[in-house]
């Protein structure tokens, strides 16, 4: 019984702390793991930080279409309850192709596209 009461108190505390967090729009960085060379495989990263609430949609795009084999890092947060997430996928830079990250969050009126 005491263990259940402690767990309930902890959940209430976490909920109250979460209520203090203001809605925050994400900050987005799109970059390659290493220096990009045309025709050489690399890893495209989309690092999204500073957002709240935690629900967010992040997609990597090649010429406007989703890139396959995307990996999602763990969702983590800081002391202000602002969240961050890394999304990445292998890609090969080629002339004429456009690589980007599309982010949709409740603080945005519509999804935003951030080009690499």
Model-derived features: positions:
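Terminal anchoring/processing modules of extracellular glycoproteins
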Residues: 1-116
